[in-house]
Amino acid sequence: HLLTCGYNDAVTEGKIKDIPYMLGSTADDIGVFPEMKEKGEHGGIYKGCINWSLALEKLGRKPAYVYYFTRALLGDDAGAFHSSELWYMFGTLGRSWRPKTEGDYALSKEMMDDWTNFMKTGNPNAEGKDDWKPCTKDDPYVQVLDVRK
């Protein structure tokens, strides 16, 4: 078996790697399930990311960086749906049929830089930049990713 215990047990028992993590969600992650939105369950993924990073901190683990992608993609009313951040993260906006603005390309560049820095160093901030802080109990910081107005 690949997984020998449940996710919650793995975290609380320290059975996960002690590495920095980057995790997040989109503003409309469950937009395809309006009944969940009506019940107020749409924040569960967002809150889960924060709770996970706080659990890591409690165990004395390396930091977790949390993001919240809020860019409502143009072209219809789907909003910032599940996986919509991937076009930005991987610089593949041209593969989407949706209209884009200069702000979309700037956001994509920023996200590619952040993810590249994280893969190289375990920290999404470029040298001399420190705007993306780890999510901690004292400062449950979440980096909001959207086009600049």
Residue ranges and their predicted role:
Residues 5-149:
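C-terminal helix-and-tail extensions that cap enzymatic domains
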Residues 2:
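GGW-centered surface loops in extracellular recognition modules
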